[in-house]
Amino acid sequence: MTTGNGDAPVIKNAHSDIDSTNKTLLKSDALYKYVLDTTVLPREPECMRDLRLITDKHQWGFMQSSADEAQLLGMLLKMAGAKRTIEVGVFTGYSLLATALALPEDGKVVAIDPDRESYEIGRPFLEKAGVAHKVDFREGKGLEKLDELLAEEAAAGREAAFDFAFVDADKPNYVKYHEQLLQLVRVGGHIVYDNTLWAGTVALPPDTPLSDLDRRFSVAIRDLNSRLAADPRIDVCQLAIADGITICRRLV
């Protein structure tokens, strides 16, 4: 749950009465623990576990992707046979590490985030896992860096040559990211958006008291969800995993 534009320091104190540290929308803590203990944590690579535990102690650790979400991300990448990928919103790199581990030896992930300091926390784990060579980290705001990437691809004579993209960044810009990524990800490729249920606020009545940040992000996510549902350029599937994940497959 990263912002991608440097909003991280203010988020934790800007939430409404929402438990932003809760990594699941499941109503049963026991059921979520069962999922984690049965099929997720026993298969979590040691390097990912170590990074997750260190990030949990970070003052913004609640922004970290959940272990079951990271497992799903790795599975999607392998099922898609992805080789060239994009990640918008990195934080300490837990989901980035999951991506790098899932990619083939010659795979590459362009990772974009304005917060290099947080990325540096996770970089030693990428190196220890032997996958740092797969990561092309680009410090800066998501929209600007994606525009630069579009220009680079055009200069190299490549059009829509990425296989996969994962977005966990500033929610008000998700709709703009979608248009950029549709130009970067190939037909048949996938774009995955995180936090598409925003702690359940998307289903609350309009007059529900919310903090300014939660209202702004919830409105942005509802707008995204409506647009994705009506977008004829993609297949779309929304899952109630973690804080909501939406998987898009480009059709045209």
UniProtKB/Swiss-Prot annotation:
Organism of origin: Oryza sativa subsp. japonica (Rice)
Task performed by this protein: Catalyzes the stepwise methylation of tricetin to its 3'-mono- and 3',5'-dimethyl ethers. No 3',4',5'-trimethylated ester derivatives are produced. Can use caffeoyl-CoA, 5-hydroxyferulic acid, luteolin, tricetin, quercetin, myrcetin and 7,8-dihydroxyflavone as substrates, but not naringenin, apigenin or kaempferol. The 2,3-double bond and the O-dihydroxyl group of the substrate are both required for catalytic activity of the enzyme.
Known cofactor(s): Mg(2+); Mn(2+); Co(2+)
Keywords attached to this entry: Magnesium, Metal-binding, Methyltransferase, Nucleus, S-adenosyl-L-methionine, Transferase
Main location as per UniProt: nucleus
Record carries keyword Cytoplasm: no
Tissue note: Ubiquitous. Highest expression in stems and roots.
Reaction catalyzed: tricetin + 2 S-adenosyl-L-methionine = 3',5'-di-O-methyltricetin + 2 S-adenosyl-L-homocysteine + 2 H(+)
Family (UniProt): Belongs to the class I-like SAM-binding methyltransferase superfamily. Cation-dependent O-methyltransferase family. CCoAMT subfamily.
Protein name: Tricin synthase 1
Gene Ontology biological process terms in this record: methylation
Record SUPFAM superfamilies: S-adenosyl-L-methionine-dependent methyltransferases
InterPro entries recorded: Cation-dep_OMT, SAM-dependent_MTases_sf, SAM_O-MeTrfase
Compartments where found: Nucleus
Binding site for S-adenosyl-L-methionine: S65, E87, G89, V90, S95, D113, D170
Molecular function terms from GO: metal ion binding; O-methyltransferase activity; S-adenosylmethionine-dependent methyltransferase activity
Cofactor note: Binds 1 divalent metal cation per subunit. Fully active with Mg(2+). Active at 80% with Mn(2+) or Co(2+) ions. Active at less than 10% with Ca(2+) or Zn(2+) ions.
